């Protein structure tokens, strides 16, 4: 928490911790627990006498992995990929710590199928599909076809979205207002086995909050409390481009926006051709360097 508030230790509370559910799937079993712990915290280096309690939901999964392992690749910090750590114990005198790249094993016969929550409204589904289509254009150029496939939750009674080994895009009915994505990875190789993407109910809250103070002076669409669904869908498409990138093993690339100069970001010709950042893995959602009058000239916002 910015270095001011630090968790020193946690003491599990067995009386208020319990097993919530146990599920069996085709190739794995999952146990979900509600775990409560008392925290010892320090504020600016001083240990507090208060011990607040924290309750979290923890899912533990045992999966049957394929005997055929994907070839590993050593991670390099100069390349924008995700990674997992490993320790090589084969040398008894000196252990070796290293990092594997996290990546998908994508072929024309092995697409990446995402099952999307049927609670997500149709306009948002179209925005998400647009993001998948943008990625598929790249794969088509590589001769892999269109490997990212979006399907609605199956109506079959055997389908369960909480299966940790399938790719899902879920509608999150919580206080979060950001799109989230996390991968389930084969720790032996770094192969990404599945991805869970969450689309929050309160996405409009984030769009409005960031849009008002970054874009209200430039774009009249943000000068209202109720943001138009069209604007939310544009924002969702940009967020999902990054989420799909994370699901493929790419890392956040905050240097993407540093590649363009302020002059370029105010140029209609440049922004229409190259967009507002050099990487979809950036966190930039708005062209907040634009000035009043730039939109009318054709600058992409």
Language-model segments: which ranges?
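Solvent-exposed, acidic/flexible segments
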Residues: 121-128, 132, 229-237, 274
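Conserved catalytic/binding loops enriched for acidic/polar residues
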Residues: 256-301
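Zn2+-dependent metallopeptidase catalytic core
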Residues: 119-147
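Active-site recognition of the HExxH zinc-binding catalytic motif
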Residues: 133-136, 190, 234, 238-253
């Amino acid at each position: 928490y910015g270095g001011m508030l630090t968790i020193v230790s946690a003491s599990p509370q067995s009386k208020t911790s319990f097993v919530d559910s146990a599920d069996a799937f085709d190739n794995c079993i999952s146990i979900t627990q509600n775990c409560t712990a008392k925290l010892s915290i320090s504020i600016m280096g001083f240990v507090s006498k208060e011990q607040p309690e924290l309750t979290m939901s923890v899912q533990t999964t045992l999966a049957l992995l394929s005997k055929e392992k994907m070839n590993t690749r050593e991670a390099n910090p100069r390349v924008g990929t995700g990674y997992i750590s490993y320790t090589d114990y084969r040398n008894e005198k000196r252990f070796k710590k290293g990092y594997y790249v996290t990546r998908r094993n994508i072929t024309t016969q092995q697409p990446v199928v995402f099952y999307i929550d049927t609670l997500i409204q149709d306009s948002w589904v179209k925005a998400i599909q647009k993001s998948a289509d943008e990625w598929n254009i790249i794969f088509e150029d590589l001769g892999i076809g269109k490997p990212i496939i979006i399907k609605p939750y199956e109506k079959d009674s055997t389908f369960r979205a909480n299966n940790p080994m399938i790719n899902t895009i879920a509608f999150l009915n919580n206080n979060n207002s950001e799109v989230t994505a996390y991968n389930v990875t084969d720790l032996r190789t770094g192969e990404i086995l599945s991805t869970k993407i969450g689309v929050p109910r309160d996405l409009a809250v984030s769009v409005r909050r960031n849009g008002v103070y970054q874009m209200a002076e430039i774009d009249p669409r943000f000068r209202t409390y109720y943001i138009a669904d069209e604007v939310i869908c544009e924002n969702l498409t940009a967020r999902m481009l990054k989420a799909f990138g994370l699901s493929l093993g790419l890392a956040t690339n905050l240097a993407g926006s540093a590649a363009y100069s302020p002059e370029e970001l105010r140029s209609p010709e440049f922004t229409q051709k190259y967009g507002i950042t050099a990487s979809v893995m950036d966190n930039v959602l708005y062209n907040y360097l634009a000035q009043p009058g730039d939109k009318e000239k054709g600058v992409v916002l």
